Amino acid sequence: YIRHGLRRSEQPADHERAVKAIRILRSLGVQVTETGTQACASPMSRVMAYSKSKAEALVPILTEEQRVLGEGIRAVVITDYEKTSAVIDEIRHLLDEESGGAIAAFKQLLSDEVTDRLDPVLVTGSTVLVDDDLVEEFLAASRQWLEEHGGDVELTTEEHEGFSLVRGKGSNWSPRLYVRMITELFQQGVTRCLVGTRGLLGEGWDASRINVLLDLTAA
């Protein structure tokens, strides 16, 4: 109707209606072109994809999974990114740079007494964050693993509210090394919940003891 009716109308008011309708449809994720319609990125789709409610839903889900699986739970939370750079001005009042990302999911888990018991660890291509309850055990287990696997790395920590940022000093410290190390600690149960991005914990990554997978990606 927009293409064949309003746009072809001889009435200027119809052309204005077409422009308004196209603008509204685009905000809903539908783009009207010269030949038809197609899906497109939109403010609404971004709000839905990066909604804080997705992270908040982790708590009741993992609470129930932990009740059923007990100490044997091995949960993985996958997000699209560590934090988003896709927040545009018109929705900035609804989303911040952490919305929908791994850091937001990690902090959500730490905020609840039950999910905090899973001792979550966040791992991305640039960052390792560890629940403050787990830091000492994590460092001890990591240093032992590095010693056994020839990793000449010195680990340091930077404390934040509720968690610590773990850094490695040494030429061997890289995502390839620390993802392998953290995966093994996860398998052992040092941590029972990993939070990461699909780029690292997606296709090609394997941990045989996973029994809970929560996919927060937009795909």
Give residue spans per PLM region.
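Conserved C-terminal RecA-like helicase domain
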Residues: 1-193
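A short beta-strand element within the Helicase C-terminal
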Residues: 195, 200-218
